[in-house]
Structures are given as C-alpha cells and as structure tokens.
Amino acid sequence: MRPEYAVLFLALIALTYARSNEDVREEIKNEIEKDILEDLVEDEGELDDKAIDVNDAKPFRIRFRRIRWRKLVPYIPVALKLAGKK
C-alpha cells in the first residue's frame, strides 16, 4: 500500500472514532510527520549511494566537456533526419 493511501486510511479511521475535530487534526498531523520522518531515513542511504555514482562518472564528464559543440550544432538537424529515415 502506498504511503499516501495509508495516511488517508488512517485519517478515515480517525474520523470515525474521533471525539472532536481537533483530535482528528492532531492524529492526521502525527501520522504525516511520522511518514515524513520514515521517508527521510530511507532517503539518507539513497543519497549516499548516488554520491559514489557521480564520482565514477567523472572521466566521462571530462570527455563530454571537451566536445566542441559550436562545430557540431549545424550537423544536428542532418543527424535527426537520417535517424528518422531508418
């Protein structure tokens, strides 16, 4: 179940059993904060993994920057036409 649907489901349960509107608001707020904190904890590991990939791509970035784009720009429409015919 997606986190958004889980939050909505919990909000529906809170609406049915709540005594007042303020209780419902506080319950929804607590659940959303909990989900956000869980997502942040999960994302920490992903950001660390991506940093390694960026370092691995450094040689390719250097080669890509050395390309003389002004000399290649006139050939782009020709390459697109040839690719479209195949």
Curated annotation (Swiss-Prot):
Signal peptide bounds: 1-18
In this chain, where does the modification Alanine amide occur? Answer: 83
What main location does UniProt list?
Answer: secreted
* Tissues/organs with expression: Expressed in entodermal epithelium along the body column.
The propeptide segment or segments lie at 19-57
UniProt keywords, alphabetically: Amidation, Antibiotic, Antimicrobial, Immunity, Innate immunity, Membrane, Secreted, Signal, Target cell membrane, Target membrane
Recorded GO cellular component terms are: extracellular region
Q: Indicate where this protein resides in the cell.
A: Secreted; Target cell membrane
The reply on keyword Secreted is yes
* Family named by the database record: Belongs to the arminin family.
The role this protein plays is: Antimicrobial peptide with a broad-spectrum antimicrobial activity. Keeps its antibacterial activity under a wide range of salt concentrations that mimic physiological conditions of human blood, which is surprising, since Hydra is an obligate freshwater animal with nearly no salt tolerance. Does not affect red blood cells.
What name does the UniProt record give this protein? Arminin 7246
**Organism listed in the record:** Hydra viridissima
